[in-house]
Amino acid sequence: MQMPNLHLGALLSGSLNSTASHLVTLPKVIIKYEQKDITSDIQPYLLSVSYTDYLEGQSDEVQVELEDVDGRWRQKWYPEQGDKISLEIGDQINGMLKLGSMELAEIEYQHPPSVITLKALSTGITKSNRTQRGRAYEHTTLADIVRRIARRLHLKVTGTIRHIPIERVTQYQERDVEFLTRLAKEYGHTFKIVGRQLVFQANDALAEQKPVAVLLPEDIKNFRLRDLIKGVPQEAVVSGYDAKRKTTRRTRRRSKALRPGGKRASSGDTLKIVANRGESQAQVNARADAALANAQQSQVAGNFSMVGNAKLVAGQVVQLKGFGKFSGKYLVKQARHEIRRGGGFTSDLEVKMVEYVPDEPPQATAATQPKKQAAKNANS
């Protein structure tokens, strides 16, 4: 992108700020392109900016949508390969969320009307994490494997990793990122790379967090929540071969009910977990427990849209209150924050329930007391 003293940096604190306001919040965005502030330069062309934060499986993403009536974004301002974008997004009430540098990954042109969309991702594809590897890890732990791969990728490990002994696990000609993604899923963790950090976090540790916000129905613009009545496995059968005793071993693992005291989901489904060669019983049990927990936390899930709050990000817990049987603590799987010209500042969250928290029953009054109690009061 050839611009004198321009490289995409501080964005949107002008035109969108003046048009996209709310009763309690005034949105603000700052973008840097190759560490240079170009807010005032691109302000006349800016249609929207969005940031999507994923819990796992995908790189975080920034999209900048620009008018291109005169063709400058297709020609002299056309971005160059490897350019970096950084972003700050937020408002005057909740504060700003500062993101790290992201690498430009895609440029889209559509017409009519003539619009250019820039997409940037939080991680670039480097030679080290493209390499396919085949090897076995023996007599180690999950944490040790993660740290070993992080050193190979020159990344710093962050997050809480549960102590899970690993007798043997094999990397089957997989890229390191693919292998870590599989390990995380199999052993109840989430994984992604953010900048120079390798985030590997136990799912139960995420679920145990205190809610960062308590949301009532009136706090949400629209929502969709669903509860799977059937199809949620309640049990896992673990089978494997005991080489020493030369017998087949089989154990059963049960999940905890999402709503304690309530009727368990109607399901005859049972997960079947088969031990791989060299796996210990503790190792395969950990895989079974992770599979059950993942299935259970997928039972109640959904998404909702609310007035923008960039401080709500993937991996946090929010509590929904006043939603009846849907009330409870929810883990944020994905958060998308968007400021759009004429459309204001919105946050869209994808969530799953990690703990049911019943609503407090209304306090009894004289008008709502049971008839028996009312009669007793009359005779006293």
Report each predicted region and the residues it spans.
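Short beta-strand-centered interaction patches in the first periplasmic/extracellular domains
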Residues: 2-9, 115-124, 161-224, 230
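Amphipathic, non-transmembrane alpha-helical segments in extracytoplasmic/periplasmic proteins
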Residues: 63-66, 120, 132-158, 171-194, ...
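Assembly/oligomerization scaffold segments
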Residues: 1-125
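An acidic/polar, Gly/Ser/Thr-rich interaction patch typically located in mid-to-C-terminal regions
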Residues: 49-80, 221-380
